[in-house]
Amino acid sequence: MQRIIGTEVEYGISSPSDPTANPILTSTQAVLAYAAAAGIQRAKRTRWDYEVESPLRDARGFDLSRSAGPPPVVDADEVGAANMILTNGARLYVDHAHPEYSAPECTDPLDAVIWDKAGERVMEAAARHVASVPGAAKLQLYKNNVDGKGASYGSHENYLMSRQTPFSAIITGLTPFLVSRQVVTGSGRVGIGPSGDEPGFQLSQRSDYIEVEVGLETTLKRGIINTRDEPHADADRYRRLHVIIGDANLAETSTYLKLGTTALVLDLIEEGPAHAIDLTDLALARPVHAVHAISRDPSLRATVALADGRELTGLALQRIYLDRVAKLVDSRDPDPRAADIVETWAHVLDQLERDPMDCAELLDWPAKLRLLDGFRQRENLSWSAPRLHLVDLQYSDVRLDKGLYNRLVARGSMKRLVTEHQVLSAVENPPTDTRAYFRGECLRRFGADIAAASWDSVIFDLGGDSLVRIPTLEPLRGSKAHVGALLDSVDSAVELVEQLTAEPR
């Protein structure tokens, strides 16, 4: 497997000592405190390069018009515009009223788990650093998707695809998969409906906020398929599939399967026709209704209607995708990572079919439901009890000593796929097999000489009359194998840029 993938997570934020605190301000404090603790002076903080951003470009071939006026100019010093690129190649910034960690590009789904988990440690450290500032309010950060008051914030996934793949084929092939995968990838939620007012438990935190089948926007009229066409790469060759329907996961198996199975289904969409594998027979009659119906049935027995009249459960749909992906994987050269994803996927589906609680050491929603059921029985509570919402929230607390997920890990009740050493290394270091290596190492070695950066560029300020932009439009270039020796051979940013911009002989 070598598909470029990555995650971006907006974290929930609260200030228990000051409930009226402005979340934009507290999110800004979190990002700036982390920057200060990393020894980055404000004047030398690398800015984000917004020049290549085009969030209103639609994959269906048009640009969504702004309501009025020209594109806004972002002042990097404004409250709410705090932004930094980390030495691991990630982006840490304020998105709306939340601190967001956008992980660096990876090619291996297990690596993506590691660098996504590193984001949790970054956020924990950010809150800790804010607490060390005299007079600053204490912050608590949560890796979740709902605030309990009707708002949802995103945990998005990104997958690089061939531009040659028709977007209509992506919609057809991916929609039933995304609708049904929540039986594996849901993080669990107390409450039904956007505000969570109706008592009960559901699989996904995100499902109640999905309103349309296909759409460009991410904060309203959210679609099962998002159409943002912003590849952050060579637009003639690539598209970036931006997936917004997913939950913020803490369980490593949930994240691994979320990313790994989706990447393999995209292989199926791109390569399936050559292997006589068709997905059109899985079209759903009412996809948005199906998202809600599957999420609201933790017994996993709810069925949804297909366009051809069949009724299938979410598990049955996942089983069909598994079988077709397995057929594709078997037809290719041996790929240990793809084989492991298929094996893990099959194992989890078997356990969910037998008893979802058999997955309580692997997946988020069964783990959370087991905690909640135990608490309900001990305290004789119904699903309408407000204290259950607090347990739900505490599960996602990023503090290692307080978060209920992290406490399950500490006592051996949640299976890990990666080591803490790998996670802590990923906090500081980039993946070695993508352009994130070049970005992160440039920040580490020459941070004072970098004016700005983005996913597809690094901009150097070498003291001359103009800045120097080094494009990184090819995601697999800029790896350690590609530029490691070059970076080791130079002593300054000036030397590096001279080498990169020299005319070939």
Swiss-Prot record:
Its EC number is 3.4.-.-, 3.5.1.119. GO terms for molecular function: ATP binding; hydrolase activity, acting on carbon-nitrogen (but not peptide) bonds, in linear amides; metal ion binding; peptidase activity. Transmembrane segments: none annotated. One of its GO terms (biological process) is modification-dependent protein catabolic process. Keywords: ATP-binding, Hydrolase, Magnesium, Metal-binding, Nucleotide-binding, Virulence. InterPro entries: Pup_deamidase, Pup_ligase/deamidase. Interacts with the prokaryotic ubiquitin-like protein Pup. Belongs to the Pup ligase/Pup deamidase family. Pup deamidase subfamily. Specifically catalyzes the deamidation of the C-terminal glutamine of the prokaryotic ubiquitin-like protein Pup to glutamate, thereby rendering Pup competent for conjugation. Also displays depupylase (DPUP) activity, removing conjugated Pup from target proteins; is thus involved in the recycling of Pup and may function similarly to deubiquitinases (DUBs) in eukaryotes to prevent or promote proteasomal degradation of certain proteins. This is Pup deamidase/depupylase.
